[in-house]
């Protein structure tokens, strides 16, 4: 499929003998995951997204599990361990002009207003109050709060972010 997909979850280890698998949501909540509609799966070591035939998604305590259709034992389920679950990009809500999806920030180069490089965004830590950009440059790692106060500009098309931040903050 040539559509762009957005990863919303990752499948972990098998959970029960009947083929249930651990599901690790990449969204804020299971309710958000369920609201996206049709899910697709990308098996490990492939670049192909296929429509997912899920039987059920279960939440027990703070864990989430998925049962795939026609998978009835742990041995068969093992081939899905580390698979990605995604949705077509068009299924995501339209963002306001000043909003971005955190996943779109990954891979952006980050420089400050003095043109000092902080490297590339490799991860984002969600603190509850705001996101924090995790930037890597050579052997250094920089944590930069993702708040309007410090973000001077973003150009996601050219994957560049300019920040009002210094190395010694």
Curated annotation (Swiss-Prot):
The keyword Ligase does not apply. Keywords: Chaperone, Cytoplasm, Ribosome biogenesis, rRNA processing. An accessory protein needed during the final step in the assembly of 30S ribosomal subunit, possibly for assembly of the head region. Essential for efficient processing of 16S rRNA. May be needed both before and after RbfA during the maturation of 16S rRNA. It has affinity for free ribosomal 30S subunits but not for 70S ribosomes. Gene3D superfamilies: PRC-barrel domain, RimM. Belongs to the RimM family. The PRC barrel domain binds ribosomal protein uS19. Residues 96-169 form the PRC barrel domain. GO terms for biological process: ribosomal small subunit biogenesis; rRNA processing. This is Ribosome maturation factor RimM. One of its GO terms (cellular component) is ribosome. It is found in: Cytoplasm. NCBIfam families: 16S_RimM, PRK14591.1. Binds ribosomal protein uS19.
């Amino acid at each position: 499929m040539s559509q762009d997909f957005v990863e919303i979850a990752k499948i972990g280890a098998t959970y029960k003998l009947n083929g249930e698998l651990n599901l690790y949501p990449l969204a804020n909540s299971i309710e958000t995951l369920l609201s996206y509609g049709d899910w697709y799966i990308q098996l490990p070591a492939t670049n192909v997204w296929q429509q997912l035939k899920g039987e059920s998604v279960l939440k027990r305590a703070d864990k989430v599990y998925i049962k795939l259709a026609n998978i009835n034992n742990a041995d068969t389920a093992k081939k899905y361990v580390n698979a990605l679950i995604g949705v077509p990009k068009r299924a995501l809500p339209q963002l306001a002009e000043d909003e971005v999806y955190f996943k779109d920030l990954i891979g952006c180069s980050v420089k400050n207003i003095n043109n000092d490089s902080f490297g590339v965004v490799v991860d984002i830590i969600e603190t509850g109050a705001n996101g924090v950009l995790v930037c890597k440059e050579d052997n250094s790692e920089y944590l930069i709060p993702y708040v309007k106060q410090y973000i001077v500009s973003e150009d996601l098309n050219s994957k560049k972010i300019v920040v009002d931040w210094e190395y010694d903050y």
